[in-house]
């Protein structure tokens, strides 16, 4: 079961065919050859993290290995996409390392795990998944044809979204699924912020406003909408909240909050949040408490209006008049 507030350590012993790469949250401490020719991969014990963030990926993958400030960085894909990986590797790693440096400065703490692998896998039923130290992506982001600028920007956003989860989601995890927004809202906001501030894709917020925000406007006017922070009774129910409200609307609302508080208070609040909750779990109240302490004002009223209430602000007008002349008019919000 995936109860995010139950964290555990993991120790793996994996027997695999010779020549296979075996990837998990940390690097295997030892790889030995068994009498039958297979390989035994012995992993040391991991740090504590939630069960839904555990991964084991194994296969005859192609690998590109680099490092950033002594942190191992790996890129993996199936052999038939070797050329596509080679063509994309420099840009993928450039965006990754730019994001790592940006987040380390913003959060007041460096990348928290011992290595960072990115695996581009086939037949993956999600765009990407933030497994600790071993993020999986659908391999369609390794472009088969020359990519457009827009395709590269969106790929960069996905890379930085998953990287942000190493702090928001993996290092500090929601206590229960009703705080899914703490993971996805912030990863979306942070990915566009870092994309615009730290990479070549300086127009990222224009893309967000033109392509992402309208999806949230549309969904928020449906009877099926929900608040950003919403009650979830069981794990299956949480699946329905991976949508434009949690991602795009949430990111827009956090951007508004940062503008209201000021960037200095926002940074200070993030530092407090991670100092208090690193390697543990947190709730809406925990996060708002850290930001409110940094800003010197409570955020409960703001939360009720923007995080805990569904639908969007609408403006209507009524008027009265005769003979083609408006004699009175009222605006309603």
Residue ranges and their predicted role:
Residues 1-61, 65:
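Extended, low-hydrophobicity, Ser/Thr/Pro/Gly-biased non-transmembrane segments
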Residues 43, 74-332:
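Hydrophobic alpha-helical and helix-loop surface patches within well-folded domains
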Residues 5-6, 34-35, 67, 110-112, ...:
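Extracellular/periplasmic catalytic domains that process cell-envelope and extracellular macromolecules
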Residues 19, 70-72, 115:
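A generic structural signal for alpha->beta connector loops
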């Amino acid at each position: 079961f995936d109860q995010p507030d139950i964290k555990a350590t993991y120790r793996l012993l994996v027997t695999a065919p010779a020549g296979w790469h075996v990837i998990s949250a940390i690097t295997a401490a030892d790889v030995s050859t068994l009498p039958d020719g297979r390989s035994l991969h012995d992993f040391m014990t991991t740090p504590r993290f939630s069960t839904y963030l555990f991964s084991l990926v194994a296969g005859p993958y192609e690998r590109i290995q680099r490092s950033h400030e002594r942190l191992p960085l790996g890129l993996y894909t199936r052999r038939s996409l070797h050329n596509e990986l080679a063509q994309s590797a420099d840009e993928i790693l450039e965006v990754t390392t730019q994001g790592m440096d940006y987040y380390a400065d913003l959060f007041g703490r460096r990348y928290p795990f011992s290595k960072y692998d990115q695996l581009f896998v086939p037949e993956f039923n999600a765009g990407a998944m933030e497994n600790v130290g071993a993020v999986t992506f659908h391999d369609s982001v390794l472009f088969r044809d020359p990519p457009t600028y827009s395709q590269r920007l969106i790929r960069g956003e996905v890379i930085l979204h998953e990287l942000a989860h190493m702090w928001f989601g993996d290092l500090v995890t929601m206590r229960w699924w009703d705080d899914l927004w703490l993971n996805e809202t912030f990863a979306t906001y942070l990915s566009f912020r870092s994309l615009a501030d730290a990479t070549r894709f300086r127009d990222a917020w224009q893309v967000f406003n033109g392509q992402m925000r309208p999806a949230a406007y549309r969904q928020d006017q449906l009877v099926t909408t929900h608040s950003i922070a919403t009650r979830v009774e069981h794990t299956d129910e949480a699946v329905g909240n991976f949508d434009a409200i949690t991602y795009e609307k949430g990111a827009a609302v956090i951007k508004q909050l940062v503008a209201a508080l000021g960037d200095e208070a926002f940074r200070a609040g993030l530092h407090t949040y991670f100092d208090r909750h690193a390697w543990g779990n947190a709730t809406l109240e925990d996060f708002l408490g850290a930001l409110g302490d940094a800003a010197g004002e409570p955020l409960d009223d703001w939360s009720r209006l923007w995080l805990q209430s569904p639908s969007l602000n609408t403006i209507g007008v009524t008027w009265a008049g005769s003979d083609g002349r408006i004699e009175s008019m009222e605006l309603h919000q």
